[in-house]
């Protein structure tokens, strides 16, 4: 069996707020939450097979980078869905603006940034 990605861990300002919209938009659930490294707080949000680990530090860096040229940065998180249009409606209802829509072989996609300026790519494959 080839290796499989289990989770991605990234930093947010408010883990509970991020977890709430992730569950609403993607139909995920909170798998675990609790104290974390450096007096922070973490939540695991996703499905039975995979998840994102969102980490809220005790003190937040006021100058996060959003540049693709930053080494050790996160460019975007890609998520596949069964119904792109319905997911886009939920993304917009959560208060986020979608952009960079594209139809391509073998599917369709759009992007959005959350309140922490983390970029997400949402894809529906045909």
Model-identified regions with their sequence ranges:
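A short, acidic/glycine-rich surface segment
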Residues: 38-39, 60-65
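Exposed loop/turn and edge beta-strand positions of beta-sandwich/beta-sheet ligand-binding modules
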Residues: 39, 73, 106
């Amino acid at each position: 069996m080839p290796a499989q990605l289990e989770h991605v861990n990234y930093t947010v300002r408010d883990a509970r707020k991020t977890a709430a919209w992730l569950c609403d938009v993607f139909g995920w659930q909170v798998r675990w939450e609790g104290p974390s490294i450096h007096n922070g707080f973490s939540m695991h949000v996703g499905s039975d097979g995979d998840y994102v680990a969102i980490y809220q530090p005790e003190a937040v860096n006021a100058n996060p980078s959003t540049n693709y040229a930053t080494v050790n940065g996160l460019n975007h998180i890609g998520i596949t869905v069964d119904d792109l249009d319905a997911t886009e409606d939920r993304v917009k209802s959560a208060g986020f603006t979608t952009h960079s829509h594209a139809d391509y072989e073998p599917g369709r996609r759009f992007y959005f940034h959350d309140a922490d300026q983390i970029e997400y790519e949402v894809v529906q494959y045909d």
